[in-house]
Amino acid sequence: LVSKGAQRIDAASLDNAQGIVSGESDVTLSIAGKLDNGQGGLVSAQRALSFERDDTLLNNAGGRINGGSLLLKGASLDNSDGQLISQSRLDAILGGALVNAGAARLASGGDLLLRSASVDNRGGKLVSQGLLEISAGSLDNSASGTLAGQADMSLRLGGGALRNQQDGLIFSQAGALEVQAGSLDNRQGTLQAQGDNRLRIGGALDNQGGRLDSRAGNLDLQSGSLDNGAGGVLNSAKGWLKLVTGLFDNSAGVTQAQSLEIRAGQGVRNQQGHLSALGGDNRIVTADFDNQGGGLYASGLLSLDGQRFLNQGAAAGQGGKVGAGRIDFSLAGALANRFGQLESESELHLRAAAIDNSGGSLRALGRSGSTRLVAGDLNNAYGVLESANQDLDLQLSSLANAGGRILHTGNGTFGLDSGQVIRAGGELTTNGLLDIRASEWTNSSVLQAGRLNLDIGTFRQTAEGKLLAVQSFTGRGGDWSNDGLLASDGSLRLDLSGGYRGNGRATSLGDFALNAASLDLGNAASLAGGANVTLGAGNLLVNRGRITAAGDLVASAASLNNYGTLGGGG
């Protein structure tokens, strides 16, 4: 049936299999029942092509339907291995299913608006050169199916499922993509937009091995849960990524954006995963965050509010890694960083019920600001806590530092309770002031400070113990026994109401002063000053070791027994 003018067909049914219905003007088909255009059939119009009845059962399997513009109404459409093409706008309104599977192609040169009970596009192509809008109960674009639009795309499925697994592609070339569905299966599939990519998924979003991309816009995701494991990718190359979900699983996956806002009420799993932000402030609110063997990075602020943060490993080098411009964690539970790494380019603030940094490292590299740890227990055994910030503030119930190092290279306050310092063990170093007060202390650790002030009633230092000062060392107390090292690169002054004894060394590069009720120096003991040395003993001064001064040496005592060396250079 071929016409040069307008053509209209009204029938109860039409069998056009292997046939032709064609017009050089408008063509209108009003078919009450089945319209069969399969097996190479052709229906075409150079101008408007209209299927105007809602009850048409249209079979275009292996057939061709072409129009200058196309309005398609019907009960259902089977376009398997067929072609349905409009040179401009295409409107399709179906009460039942659209099947566009296999080698099928459904395309428009302008906007494409489709409404259907369901869409089966497995292996098919559904393409618009303009706007693409689909409203359906469900949509299956799996098995290398393609949904593509030149401009904005909108997929509205209500509570129905969107299937895009097995190399399915949903792509907005120059616009935004908006998806609303009950669930989304995007395993090994791709949803991509040049602009914003906005997904509202009521239930599970499975992106294992798949990609959710925004090339130049933002990635805005809401779902009941999100599985981005097994090499899945969430990518907002030039914009932010916002995620609101239940459980967010990024195990062995990649999530990256310019900035991140993640709210995962049931937790985040990032084992062997990569989660990063290239700039801006970033916030994560969750339950437990499992980063074992994973990487969490941000160029700007990384703020995390949650229950536990699990960053530990079984051995050195196997823990998780966290790096950010600034780190601020607030945890109701524990921070587990055994063999893990947390590093801030500026400030480091951690609040947790307990912190386990055994074998791990906590570092703040900025020269200003503060490092602040607020916790019940801090276990830093064989670990490293290092801060270049102005101030280091440790608010702890207990500190275990055996074999560990706490290093503060800033010049401000070293805030740690004296009781924690004397019980900690390991090495403690600060360029600032370290003020220790205790009634009794036995030291076998290494402590270093810019300025070291001690007020200790009874002090014992083993041969392994070292107390070191860069600028000044000031000590007060009762009875002191020193078998280790007391040293200052500046001045050193000790004022004791009791005695000073032992086989240890006390030395300064500047002036040295020691006043005590008595002095009893063993064979291996030494007192040495790089400038003047002043010694005062209210009672007996016994020297079996060495007492030397680069400048003047002044010693006064009620009684002096010298079996060693007394020497001054002044």
Question: Model-flagged regions — what are they?
Answer:
Residues 1-2, 16-22, 37-43, 58-65, ...:
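Short, T/G/N/S-enriched strand-turn elements that build extracellular solenoid repeat scaffolds
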Residues 5-12, 25-32, 43, 47-57, ...:
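Well-ordered beta-strand segments characteristic of repetitive beta-sheet solenoids
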